[in-house]
């Protein structure tokens, strides 16, 4: 009995103590468990490292604490004394002894209380959410009670068990309206509490209990709204990602189209061939027998041995001799023409 009370106090403490099975991790138990794992691995023909759990250990042996616990068969377990479950489900308010002030979410297993209204006779106060068109004329319940109007009905069932009521959007619109009414009721009941406390501070406990019920219902309705909020947020994220992908695709296609036009423009540029050069013309560079320039605007090619320089691509850098300056000038004219086409396309 004393051990049970000690265990319960340890689980309920703010900082729980380490589990008591840490005492089972002794050198002798570790050695015995290693031998059992080795024997189990040799019997089943698997490596020892792959053995996670050895079944059929004696229940009264300390060796069962040296291996991880078995998976919960029913999907439930206890953690620090609190029950845990693999199924994420919202517990109904009725299971916690809290009165529900509005209709349950269609399809849920919770049931609303009769008339979904809570009225106190002592202070003539109410925790029923007020409607949008309710205009309270007095904050003091002893002078004028708050009017009570029914909440919007939940979806009704059609013959055959099918829901003839609202769709998912209408359902969550109803929750939105219910949240709005709860918030107005919270403000009204808070003002009533201030009025009661100003007249008789000892009589404010009932109104404080009403406020607690309203807050718990408000929080519960918010939790019922979470799945819808998660779906809407996921839809928004997917839509943003789709828009981003479409924008990137359009930008890539635009760049590809510009590159195609640039290549077409470069293909239309005419570059004079060497055969078109007037080798024997009369120009400024000399007389008979010398390489001069005629009407052609292209320099006369000079044998490579006649001048020095380094060939880079389709030109020579640092050349000297006859025609070197004109050849350099013509090269940069061709380069400028090509870059002009690029600038015009990407401007």
From Swiss-Prot:
Q: What is its main location?
A: nucleus
Free-text function comment from the UniProt entry: Component of the Mediator complex, a coactivator involved in the regulated transcription of nearly all RNA polymerase II-dependent genes. Mediator functions as a bridge to convey information from gene-specific regulatory proteins to the basal RNA polymerase II transcription machinery. Mediator is recruited to promoters by direct interactions with regulatory proteins and serves as a scaffold for the assembly of a functional preinitiation complex with RNA polymerase II and the general transcription factors.
Gene for this protein?
A: med-7
The GO biological-process annotations, alphabetized, read as: regulation of transcription by RNA polymerase II
What family is it from?
A: Belongs to the Mediator complex subunit 7 family.
Species in which this protein is naturally found: Neurospora crassa (strain ATCC 24698 / 74-OR23-1A / CBS 708.71 / DSM 1257 / FGSC 987)
Q: Where in the cell?
A: Nucleus
Q: What is this protein called?
A: Mediator of RNA polymerase II transcription subunit 7
InterPro entries of this UniProt entry? Med7/Med21-like (IPR037212), Mediatior_Med7 (IPR009244), Mediatior_Med7_sf (IPR044888)
Keyword field:
Activator, Nucleus, Transcription, Transcription regulation
A molecular-function term among this protein's GO annotations: transcription coregulator activity
Q: Extract the ranges annotated as region (Disordered).
A: 97-172, 302-326
Instruction: Report if keyword Lipoprotein is assigned.
Output: no
Gene3D superfamilies the record matches = 6.10.140.1520, 6.10.140.200
Does the entry feature the keyword Transcription, yes or no? yes
Q: Among the entry's GO cellular component annotations, what is one?
A: core mediator complex
- Subunit relationships: Component of the Mediator complex.
Question: Residue ranges under compositional bias (Low complexity)?
Answer: 108-171, 302-312
Q: Which Pfam families match?
A: Med7
